[in-house]
Amino acid sequence: MIHALYSKLIPTLLLLVTFSNLTQAASPIADKALEAEIRKIIQEPMGELTEEKLLKLFILEAPGKSIKDLAGIEKCKNIALIRLSNNQITDIKPLKDLTNVQSLDLANNKIADIKPIAGLVKLQYIELSGNQVSDISALEKLSALNAIYMGDNKISDISAVKTLSKLSSLSLPKNQISNLAPLATISRITMLDLSDNQVADLAPLSKQTELRMLIIERNKIADLKPLVDSCKSDFSGPKRFAPFLRLYLAGNPLGADTVKQLEELKAAGVRKES
Protein backbone atom coordinates (compact mmCIF):
# COMPACT_ATOMS: atom_id res chain seq x y z
CA MET A 1 0.00 0.00 0.00
CA ILE A 2 2.82 2.36 0.92
CA HIS A 3 4.59 1.44 -2.29
CA ALA A 4 1.44 2.21 -4.24
CA LEU A 5 1.15 5.61 -2.52
CA TYR A 6 4.73 6.51 -3.42
CA SER A 7 4.09 5.39 -6.97
CA LYS A 8 1.25 7.89 -7.19
CA LEU A 9 3.24 10.69 -5.56
CA ILE A 10 6.38 10.38 -7.69
CA PRO A 11 4.83 11.71 -10.94
CA THR A 12 3.39 14.65 -9.01
CA LEU A 13 6.75 15.43 -7.41
CA LEU A 14 8.50 15.17 -10.76
CA LEU A 15 5.95 17.54 -12.26
CA LEU A 16 6.54 20.05 -9.46
CA VAL A 17 10.32 19.85 -9.86
CA THR A 18 10.00 20.23 -13.62
CA PHE A 19 7.66 23.22 -13.23
CA SER A 20 10.06 24.79 -10.73
CA ASN A 21 12.97 24.38 -13.12
CA LEU A 22 10.97 25.83 -15.99
CA THR A 23 9.98 28.81 -13.84
CA GLN A 24 13.59 29.47 -12.92
CA ALA A 25 14.75 29.06 -16.52
CA ALA A 26 12.04 31.41 -17.77
CA SER A 27 13.65 34.51 -16.25
CA PRO A 28 15.54 36.50 -18.89
CA ILE A 29 17.51 38.32 -16.17
CA ALA A 30 20.56 36.25 -15.27
CA ASP A 31 21.54 38.00 -12.03
CA LYS A 32 19.13 37.23 -9.18
CA ALA A 33 19.90 40.48 -7.37
CA LEU A 34 19.17 42.47 -10.53
CA GLU A 35 16.01 40.47 -11.16
CA ALA A 36 14.78 41.16 -7.63
CA GLU A 37 15.27 44.91 -8.07
CA ILE A 38 13.55 44.94 -11.45
CA ARG A 39 10.60 43.00 -10.04
CA LYS A 40 10.24 45.54 -7.24
CA ILE A 41 10.31 48.49 -9.60
CA ILE A 42 7.79 47.12 -12.11
CA GLN A 43 5.69 45.59 -9.30
CA GLU A 44 5.85 42.03 -10.60
CA PRO A 45 6.91 40.00 -7.54
CA MET A 46 5.83 36.66 -8.99
CA GLY A 47 5.44 35.00 -12.35
CA GLU A 48 7.36 35.03 -15.58
CA LEU A 49 9.17 38.20 -16.58
CA THR A 50 7.92 38.50 -20.12
CA GLU A 51 9.32 40.99 -22.60
CA GLU A 52 6.05 42.88 -22.36
CA LYS A 53 6.49 43.27 -18.60
CA LEU A 54 10.09 44.38 -18.99
CA LEU A 55 8.97 47.16 -21.32
CA LYS A 56 7.41 48.78 -18.24
CA LEU A 57 10.88 49.52 -16.86
CA PHE A 58 11.86 53.12 -17.52
CA ILE A 59 14.05 53.85 -14.49
CA LEU A 60 16.42 51.35 -12.86
CA GLU A 61 17.99 52.46 -9.60
CA ALA A 62 19.78 49.70 -7.70
CA PRO A 63 23.05 50.98 -6.20
CA GLY A 64 24.98 48.74 -3.83
CA LYS A 65 23.03 45.53 -4.46
CA SER A 66 25.97 43.21 -5.29
CA ILE A 67 24.87 42.98 -8.92
CA LYS A 68 27.47 41.30 -11.14
CA ASP A 69 25.76 40.36 -14.41
CA LEU A 70 23.67 42.62 -16.68
CA ALA A 71 22.61 39.84 -19.07
CA GLY A 72 18.94 40.20 -19.89
CA ILE A 73 18.75 43.94 -19.33
CA GLU A 74 18.84 44.32 -23.11
CA LYS A 75 15.16 43.32 -23.09
CA CYS A 76 14.30 46.45 -21.09
CA LYS A 77 14.16 48.49 -24.28
CA ASN A 78 12.35 51.51 -22.83
CA ILE A 79 14.79 52.16 -20.01
CA ALA A 80 15.93 55.80 -19.90
CA LEU A 81 17.81 56.02 -16.60
CA ILE A 82 20.20 53.46 -15.12
CA ARG A 83 21.84 53.87 -11.72
CA LEU A 84 23.84 50.80 -10.73
CA SER A 85 26.72 52.38 -8.85
CA ASN A 86 28.63 50.47 -6.16
CA ASN A 87 28.05 47.02 -7.60
CA GLN A 88 30.40 44.40 -9.06
CA ILE A 89 29.74 44.83 -12.77
CA THR A 90 32.53 44.11 -15.26
CA ASP A 91 30.77 43.57 -18.60
CA ILE A 92 28.40 46.20 -20.03
CA LYS A 93 27.78 44.58 -23.42
CA PRO A 94 24.08 44.04 -22.57
CA LEU A 95 23.64 47.84 -22.67
CA LYS A 96 24.72 48.27 -26.28
CA ASP A 97 21.24 48.38 -27.83
CA LEU A 98 19.47 50.37 -25.10
CA THR A 99 19.26 53.46 -27.26
CA ASN A 100 16.69 55.22 -25.06
CA VAL A 101 19.12 55.58 -22.16
CA GLN A 102 19.75 59.23 -21.32
CA SER A 103 21.40 58.89 -17.91
CA LEU A 104 23.90 56.17 -16.97
CA ASP A 105 25.54 55.83 -13.55
CA LEU A 106 27.91 52.88 -13.14
CA ALA A 107 30.32 54.46 -10.69
CA ASN A 108 32.45 52.23 -8.49
CA ASN A 109 32.20 48.98 -10.38
CA LYS A 110 34.91 46.97 -12.16
CA ILE A 111 34.43 48.19 -15.72
CA ALA A 112 37.37 48.51 -18.11
CA ASP A 113 35.73 48.41 -21.55
CA ILE A 114 33.06 51.01 -22.39
CA LYS A 115 32.90 50.38 -26.14
CA PRO A 116 29.40 48.86 -25.83
CA ILE A 117 27.90 52.28 -25.07
CA ALA A 118 29.15 53.83 -28.32
CA GLY A 119 25.67 53.64 -29.84
CA LEU A 120 23.69 55.17 -26.98
CA VAL A 121 23.02 58.33 -28.94
CA LYS A 122 20.52 59.83 -26.48
CA LEU A 123 22.96 59.69 -23.58
CA GLN A 124 23.25 63.06 -21.81
CA TYR A 125 24.80 62.14 -18.46
CA ILE A 126 27.41 59.50 -17.72
CA GLU A 127 28.99 58.68 -14.36
CA LEU A 128 31.76 56.08 -14.45
CA SER A 129 34.03 57.24 -11.65
CA GLY A 130 35.94 54.59 -9.75
CA ASN A 131 36.34 52.03 -12.53
CA GLN A 132 39.26 50.82 -14.66
CA VAL A 133 38.59 52.70 -17.90
CA SER A 134 41.52 53.84 -20.03
CA ASP A 135 39.92 54.24 -23.48
CA ILE A 136 37.03 56.73 -23.80
CA SER A 137 36.81 56.75 -27.60
CA ALA A 138 33.31 55.26 -27.29
CA LEU A 139 32.07 58.72 -26.26
CA GLU A 140 33.20 60.43 -29.44
CA LYS A 141 29.88 60.24 -31.32
CA LEU A 142 27.58 60.71 -28.34
CA SER A 143 26.79 64.28 -29.31
CA ALA A 144 23.99 64.70 -26.76
CA LEU A 145 26.40 64.33 -23.83
CA ASN A 146 26.11 67.21 -21.41
CA ALA A 147 27.96 65.80 -18.39
CA ILE A 148 30.83 63.32 -18.04
CA TYR A 149 32.04 62.14 -14.63
CA MET A 150 34.92 59.68 -14.94
CA GLY A 151 37.27 60.39 -12.07
CA ASP A 152 39.59 57.75 -10.62
CA ASN A 153 40.15 55.73 -13.79
CA LYS A 154 43.17 55.21 -16.06
CA ILE A 155 42.47 57.84 -18.70
CA SER A 156 45.33 59.65 -20.43
CA ASP A 157 43.81 60.54 -23.83
CA ILE A 158 40.72 62.79 -23.89
CA SER A 159 40.53 63.23 -27.67
CA ALA A 160 36.99 61.82 -27.67
CA VAL A 161 35.56 64.97 -26.09
CA LYS A 162 36.66 67.35 -28.85
CA THR A 163 33.43 66.78 -30.82
CA LEU A 164 31.05 67.04 -27.85
CA SER A 165 29.77 70.56 -28.39
CA LYS A 166 27.01 70.31 -25.75
CA LEU A 167 29.37 69.30 -22.95
CA SER A 168 29.04 71.55 -19.91
CA SER A 169 30.38 69.42 -17.03
CA LEU A 170 33.60 67.44 -17.36
CA SER A 171 34.99 65.77 -14.26
CA LEU A 172 38.16 63.70 -14.72
CA PRO A 173 40.13 63.85 -11.45
CA LYS A 174 42.63 61.15 -10.51
CA ASN A 175 43.56 60.08 -14.02
CA GLN A 176 46.74 60.34 -16.11
CA ILE A 177 45.87 63.35 -18.27
CA SER A 178 48.55 65.78 -19.44
CA ASN A 179 47.34 67.03 -22.83
CA LEU A 180 44.29 69.34 -22.83
CA ALA A 181 44.41 70.11 -26.57
CA PRO A 182 41.01 68.46 -27.27
CA LEU A 183 39.38 71.09 -25.05
CA ALA A 184 40.43 73.83 -27.46
CA THR A 185 37.62 72.88 -29.86
CA ILE A 186 34.68 73.09 -27.44
CA SER A 187 33.63 76.17 -25.50
CA ARG A 188 30.53 75.51 -23.38
CA ILE A 189 32.13 73.87 -20.35
CA THR A 190 30.98 75.44 -17.08
CA MET A 191 32.55 72.95 -14.64
CA LEU A 192 35.95 71.39 -15.29
CA ASP A 193 37.64 69.14 -12.74
CA LEU A 194 41.13 67.96 -13.66
CA SER A 195 42.57 67.65 -10.18
CA ASP A 196 45.23 65.01 -9.52
CA ASN A 197 46.44 64.68 -13.10
CA GLN A 198 49.64 65.67 -14.93
CA VAL A 199 48.56 68.93 -16.57
CA ALA A 200 51.22 71.60 -17.10
CA ASP A 201 49.86 73.71 -19.99
CA LEU A 202 46.59 75.64 -19.63
CA ALA A 203 46.70 77.20 -23.11
CA PRO A 204 43.99 74.89 -24.54
CA LEU A 205 41.52 76.37 -22.06
CA SER A 206 41.76 79.84 -23.59
CA LYS A 207 38.57 79.32 -25.63
CA GLN A 208 36.46 78.34 -22.63
CA THR A 209 34.06 81.26 -22.30
CA GLU A 210 31.47 79.73 -19.95
CA LEU A 211 33.64 78.46 -17.09
CA ARG A 212 32.23 78.84 -13.61
CA MET A 213 34.38 76.32 -11.75
CA LEU A 214 37.92 75.24 -12.64
CA ILE A 215 39.50 72.60 -10.41
CA ILE A 216 43.14 71.98 -11.31
CA GLU A 217 44.63 71.11 -7.94
CA ARG A 218 47.67 68.85 -7.69
CA ASN A 219 48.94 69.02 -11.25
CA LYS A 220 52.20 70.32 -12.75
CA ILE A 221 51.13 73.89 -13.43
CA ALA A 222 53.81 76.55 -13.03
CA ASP A 223 52.44 79.31 -15.27
CA LEU A 224 48.92 80.80 -15.22
CA LYS A 225 49.44 83.21 -18.13
CA PRO A 226 46.98 81.55 -20.57
CA LEU A 227 44.27 81.70 -17.94
CA VAL A 228 45.15 85.26 -16.95
CA ASP A 229 45.02 86.47 -20.56
CA SER A 230 41.67 84.79 -21.14
CA CYS A 231 40.13 86.21 -17.96
CA LYS A 232 41.46 89.73 -18.53
CA SER A 233 40.08 89.72 -22.06
CA ASP A 234 36.68 88.59 -20.83
CA PHE A 235 36.59 91.07 -17.95
CA SER A 236 37.37 94.01 -20.22
CA GLY A 237 34.74 92.86 -22.70
CA PRO A 238 31.64 90.64 -22.39
CA LYS A 239 32.19 89.55 -18.76
CA ARG A 240 30.74 86.14 -19.56
CA PHE A 241 32.79 84.07 -17.14
CA ALA A 242 35.72 85.75 -15.39
CA PRO A 243 33.65 87.55 -12.71
CA PHE A 244 31.93 84.26 -11.87
CA LEU A 245 34.88 81.88 -12.02
CA ARG A 246 35.98 79.92 -8.95
CA LEU A 247 39.53 78.60 -9.23
CA TYR A 248 40.97 75.68 -7.24
CA LEU A 249 44.73 75.63 -7.67
CA ALA A 250 46.42 74.15 -4.57
CA GLY A 251 49.26 71.67 -4.88
CA ASN A 252 50.87 72.99 -8.07
CA PRO A 253 54.54 74.02 -8.52
CA LEU A 254 53.64 77.65 -9.17
CA GLY A 255 56.49 79.82 -10.43
CA ALA A 256 57.71 83.24 -9.28
CA ASP A 257 55.39 85.09 -11.66
CA THR A 258 52.24 83.56 -10.23
CA VAL A 259 51.93 86.04 -7.35
CA LYS A 260 51.36 88.82 -9.88
CA GLN A 261 49.21 86.54 -12.05
CA LEU A 262 46.96 85.70 -9.12
CA GLU A 263 46.50 89.41 -8.45
CA GLU A 264 45.52 89.93 -12.08
CA LEU A 265 43.01 87.10 -11.85
CA LYS A 266 41.55 88.63 -8.71
CA ALA A 267 41.25 91.99 -10.46
CA ALA A 268 39.28 90.27 -13.22
CA GLY A 269 36.82 88.96 -10.64
CA VAL A 270 38.16 85.41 -10.34
CA ARG A 271 37.88 83.88 -6.88
CA LYS A 272 40.76 81.66 -5.86
CA GLU A 273 39.28 79.09 -3.51
CA SER A 274 42.45 77.24 -2.57
Describe each model-derived feature in a short phrase.
Residues K56, N78-I79, T99-V101, V121-L123, ...:
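Short "repeat-start/strand-capping" segments in structured domains, especially the N-termini
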Residues I2-L5, I10-R83, P94, P116, ...:
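N-terminal capping/linker segments that flank leucine-rich repeat
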